[in-house]
């Protein structure tokens, strides 16, 4: 397959390069990624500034470009200008940290994959759980991403599909299997610490703790039980459950 590879951690991040090295052994890979760290960019795009594109050399045989924009910008620029007619699938990742539960709304990694689907290209986001002071398990995540890709044939790929793949932090032997499941609830209970700087301004720092309320059958539940999770996503935000009710409420 011809694969467009992107991320939100930046073009020099270990995750994307681990995945690129493995995928390039079996597929044609073009890497288009942010020049700097752009985590939690969500689906933001660059409007008021020019986007700078630079070709980057990689030690494996792929074309690579850095973009002075967001993850969504990378996909837009790639599919409009750099490789407009030659991509079978967009893969975003490997992200440093999970993208499960409500966190997918903030994720530049997932949003880049969704942008691919908006261009009618099947897409997959890949994320690996990160635990502070421990070595990331990118090689395991890359192996699972390749395994998912190898199960697909071009004719199997629907152009509006977005697959969200997450790999828990554990040894490959400890992984219990793969679960196709729904998105869970929030992972963290958010709060801000507050300080006062020398000029009397409030300085807020994001903190929080792990949300212990877990719904069974969700990606959050299965990741915590050492399963790889795969969730099909879509970008239609319409709440169909109350569409008719809303019409009756406001138009009747």
From Swiss-Prot:
One of its GO terms (molecular function) is metal ion binding. It is found in: Cytoplasm. Binds 1 divalent metal cation per subunit. It catalyses: a ribonucleoside 5'-phosphate + H2O = a ribonucleoside + phosphate. Its cofactor is a divalent metal cation. Keywords: Cytoplasm, Hydrolase, Metal-binding, Nucleotide-binding. Its main location: cytoplasm. This is 5'-nucleotidase SurE. It comes from Clostridium botulinum (strain Langeland / NCTC 10281 / Type F). The lineage of its organism: Bacteria, Bacillati, Bacillota, Clostridia, Eubacteriales.
């Amino acid at each position: 397959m011809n694969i467009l590879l992107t991320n939100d951690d930046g073009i020099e991040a270990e995750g994307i390069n681990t995945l690129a090295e493995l995928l390039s052994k079996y597929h044609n890979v073009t890497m288009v990624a942010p020049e700097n760290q752009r985590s939690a960019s969500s689906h933001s795009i660059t409007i008021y500034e020019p986007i700078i594109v630079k070709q980057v050399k990689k030690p494996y045989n792929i074309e690579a470009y850095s973009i002075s924009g967001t993850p969504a910008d990378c996909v837009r620029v790639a599919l409009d200008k750099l490789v407009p007619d030659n991509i079978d699938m967009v893969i975003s990742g490997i992200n440093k940290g999970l993208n499960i539960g409500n966190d997918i709304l903030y994720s530049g990694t997932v949003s880049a994959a969704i942008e691919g689907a908006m261009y009618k290209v099947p897409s997959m986001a890949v994320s690996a759980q990160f635990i502070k002071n421990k070595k990331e398990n990118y090689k395991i995540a890359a192996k699972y991403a390749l395994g998912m890709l190898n199960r697909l044939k071009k004719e199997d790929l629907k152009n509006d599909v977005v697959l969200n793949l997450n790999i828990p932090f554990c040894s490959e032997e400890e992984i219990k299997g793969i679960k196709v499941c729904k998105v869970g609830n929030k992972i963290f209970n958010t709060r801000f610490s507050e300080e006062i700087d020398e000029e009397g301004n409030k300085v807020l720092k994001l903190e929080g703790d792990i949300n212990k309320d877990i719904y069974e059958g969700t990606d959050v539940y299965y990741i915590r039980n050492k399963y790889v999770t795969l969730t099909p996503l879509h970008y239609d935000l319409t709440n169909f459950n109350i569409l008719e009710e809303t019409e009756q409420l406001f138009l009747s």
